[in-house]
UniProtKB/Swiss-Prot annotation:
GO terms for molecular function: mu-type opioid receptor binding; Wnt-protein binding. Residues 101-202 are annotated as: Interaction with Wnt proteins. This is Protein wntless homolog. It comes from Rattus norvegicus. The keyword Transmembrane applies. Signal peptide: none annotated. One of its GO terms (biological process) is positive regulation of Wnt protein secretion. The lineage of its organism: Eukaryota, Metazoa, Chordata, Craniata, Vertebrata.
Length: 541
C-alpha cells in the first residue's frame, strides 16, 4: 500500500528537506536585504508658477519650469498684482524628473500625491466642503529637444480637507492651513524619459469654480516610483522561480496521473495552487521594459488575487478532508460555506480594483476616493471583503481545532499497536501537525514582516552593513510562499514506496478494526490508504 511522500519519508530525510528549504528561505531574505536597494524612491517637486498671457487658453501650450525654453515665471502671487496677471493666466509647471536626470522603464510605475500650501486670509477663507478644480495636462518626450506629446488632459476635482489650528484673527494672517495630502496621479508604466505637468486653476465666480479655496501659495508634488535596482533583482527572482515551480508542478501531476485512479480533490487543489503560483511567477514584466503596458499594475493585482484565493481555499479543503466522512469528502460542493466567503470577498476586491486602476488606464488622474459616492462605494466593497475574511478565518480556526481534537482522540488507540506501527503513526501525526504549524508560521511571518517594514525607517545598519528591511520583506515573503507551494507539491505527491503485507491493517493492534490514517491522498486502486482515516471515524461518530 502506497502513501504520500510525507508519510513514507523518514524523520531524518524530512529534516534534511526542511533544512534545504530553510537555506533557500534565508537566501531569499538576504537577496532583498543585502543586494537589492529600497523598493521605491520618493522625489519632492515644487511647481513653478509660469505665466501664460495668451488671450485664450483653449489650445494646449507647454510651459517648462527650467531649461533653454523656460517659461516666464513669478515667485509669488503678490508679484502678479502689480503686473496685472490674473489667476487664469498662472500655470503650475512640474518637470519629471528633476534637472540632469531621466526616467527609465525599470521604474515600472509612477504615483503622485498632491500637497497644496494655502495661507489664511480673513477675506479669503476656505469654505466648508471646498473643492479645488484643476485643469491638468500631462505630456512626454524622449529627448530634450523634441516637442511635447500630450498623454492626458483632464479636469481633476479634489476636495480640500484643511484645518487651521490658530485663532482666526488678523495677527495670524499668512499662516498656513494644515491640509491633507491628495491623491493626484498614477501611471502603470514609465515608457518615456521626460514628463511635464501643467496645472491650471481656472476661476469662474459665476459657476463657483475655485471660489472659497483660500489663498494658494504653492503646489507641491511627491512622486513615488520603483527603484530600478530593485526591479532587476525582482525580475531575476521571478525568472529563477518560474521554472522551479513549473518543473515540480509537472512532476507532481505526472505522479498523480500514473496512478490507476482519478485525482482526488486535495490533489487537484494542490495542483491548482501550483498553477496560480506559476501564474504569479511568469516574468511578463520583462516586456514592460520595451512596451508601454500601463495595465501591468492591474494585471499584477489580479494575479495576486487568484493566488491568495487558491491559498485560502487550499487551507480550508486541507483541513476539511481530514474531518469529513467517505460520502462528503472529495467534493468541492461540500465546502460552499467556507469557500463562499472567499469568492465573495475576492469579487468585491476585484470590483474595487477595476473601479480604481481599471479607470486609471484611460484617466491617470482618477481616484475613487475623491468623491463622496466613490468613497462610500469603495468602503462598502472593502467592508464586505473584510467581513468575508473574518468569516473565513472563523471557519478555518474551527476546522483546525476540530482536526487537532480528532487526532488527539485517536492517539488513545496508539498504545495498543505494535511498536513499529505505533512509531509509524506517531510520525504521521507529527508530520501533519508540523505542516499545520509551518502554515501558521508562514502566515505569521507575512504579517510580522509587513508590520516591521511599515514601522521601521526602511533599513537597519549593523556596523558597515546596511540591511534594506522593506526589500527583504518583499523578496523574503515572495520566496517563502514559493517554497511553501514547492514543499506541498513535493511532500504530498504519491510515493512509490509500498508497505509489506506484515504491515496490513491486521497488524495495527486496533481491535475495533478501524484503519488509522492521517492525510487525504488516495493512492491504492481499491480505496483510501495512508491518508485520512485517522480522523474519519471520529467525524462519523
Amino acid at each position: 500500500m502506497a502513501g504520500a511522500i510525507i508519510e513514507n519519508m523518514s524523520t531524518k530525510k524530512l529534516c534534511i528537506v526542511g533544512g534545504i528549504l530553510l537555506v533557500f528561505q534565508i537566501v531569499a531574505f538576504l537577496v532583498g536585504g543585502l543586494i537589492a536597494p529600497a523598493p521605491t524612491t520618493a522625489v519632492s517637486y515644487v511647481a513653478a508658477k509660469c505665466v501664460d498671457v495668451r488671450k485664450n487658453h483653449h489650445k494646449t501650450r507647454w510651459l517648462m519650469p527650467w531649461g533653454p525654453n523656460k517659461c516666464n515665471k513669478i515667485n509669488d502671487f503678490e508679484e502678479a498684482i502689480p503686473r496685472e496677471i490674473e489667476a487664469n493666466d498662472i500655470v503650475f509647471s512640474v518637470h519629471i524628473p528633476l534637472p540632469s536626470m531621466e526616467m527609465s522603464p525599470w521604474f515600472q510605475f509612477m504615483l503622485f500625491i498632491l500637497q497644496i500650501d494655502i495661507a489664511f486670509k480673513l477675506n479669503n477663507q476656505i469654505r466648508e466642503n471646498a473643492e479645488v478644480s484643476m485643469d491638468v495636462s500631462l505630456g512626454y518626450r524622449d529627448d530634450m529637444f523634441s516637442e511635447w506629446t500630450e498623454m492626458a488632459h483632464e479636469r481633476v476635482p479634489r476636495k480640500l480637507r484643511c484645518t487651521f489650528t490658530s485663532p482666526k484673527t488678523p495677527e495670524h494672517e499668512g499662516r498656513h492651513y494644515e491640509c491633507d495630502v491628495l491623491p493626484f496621479m498614477e501611471i502603470g508604466s514609465v515608457a518615456h524619459k521626460y514628463y511635464l505637468l501643467n496645472i491650471r486653476l481656472p476661476v469662474n465666480e459665476k459657476k463657483k469654480i475655485n471660489v472659497g479655496i483660500g489663498e494658494i501659495k504653492d503646489i507641491r508634488l511627491v512622486g513615488i516610483h520603483q527603484n530600478g535596482g530593485f526591479t532587476k533583482v525582482w525580475f531575476a527572482m521571478k525568472t529563477f522561480l518560474t521554472p522551479s515551480i513549473f518543473i515540480i508542478m509537472v512532476w507532481y501531476w505526472r505522479r498523480i496521473t500514473m496512478m490507476s485512479r482519478p485525482p482526488v480533490l486535495l490533489e487537484k487543489v494542490i495542483f491548482a495552487l501550483g498553477i496560480s503560483m506559476t501564474f504569479i511567477n511568469i516574468p511578463v514584466e520583462w516586456f514592460s521594459i520595451g512596451f508601454d503596458w500601463t495595465w501591468m499594475l492591474l494585471f499584477g493585482d489580479i494575479r495576486q488575487g487568484i493566488f491568495y484565493a487558491m491559498l485560502l481555499s487550499f487551507w480550508i479543503i486541507f483541513c476539511g478532508e481530514h474531518m469529513m466522512d467517505q460520502h462528503e469528502r472529495n467534493h468541492i460542493a461540500g465546502y460552499w460555506k467556507q469557500v463562499g466567503p472567499i469568492a465573495v470577498g475576492s469579487f468585491c476586491l476585484f470590483i474595487f480594483d477595476m473601479c480604481e486602476r481599471g479607470v486609471q488606464l484611460t484617466n491617470p488622474f482618477y481616484s475613487i476616493w475623491t468623491t463622496d459616492v466613490g468613497t462610500e462605494l469603495a468602503m462598502a466593497f472593502i467592508i464586505v471583503a473584510g467581513i468575508c475574511l473574518c468569516l473565513y478565518f472563523l471557519f478555518l480556526c474551527f476546522m483546525v481545532f476540530q482536526v487537532f481534537r480528532n487526532i488527539s482522540g485517536k492517539q488513545s488507540s496508539l498504545p495498543a499497536m505494535s511498536k513499529v506501527r505505533r512509531l509509524h503513526y506517531e510520525g504521521l501525526i507529527f508530520r501533519f501537525k508540523f505542516l499545520m504549524l509551518i502554515t501558521l508560521a508562514c502566515a505569521a511571518m507575512t504579517v510580522i514582516f509587513f508590520i516591521v517594514s511599515q514601522v521601521t525607517e526602511g533599513h537597519w545598519k549593523w556596523g558597515g552593513v546596511t540591511v534594506q528591511v522593506s526589500s527583504a520583506f518583499f523578496t523574503g515573503i515572495y520566496g517563502m510562499w514559493n517554497l511553501y507551494v514547492f514543499a506541498l507539491m513535493f511532500l504530498y505527491a504519491p510515493s512509490h514506496k509500498n508497505y509489506g503485507e506484515d504491515q496490513s491493517n491486521g497488524d495495527l493492534g486496533v481491535h475495533s478494526g478501524e484503519e488509522l490514517q492521517l492525510t487525504t491522498t488516495i493512492t491504492h486502486v481499491d480505496g483510501p490508504t495512508e491518508i485520512y482515516k485517522l480522523t474519519r471515524k471520529e467525524a462519523q461518530e
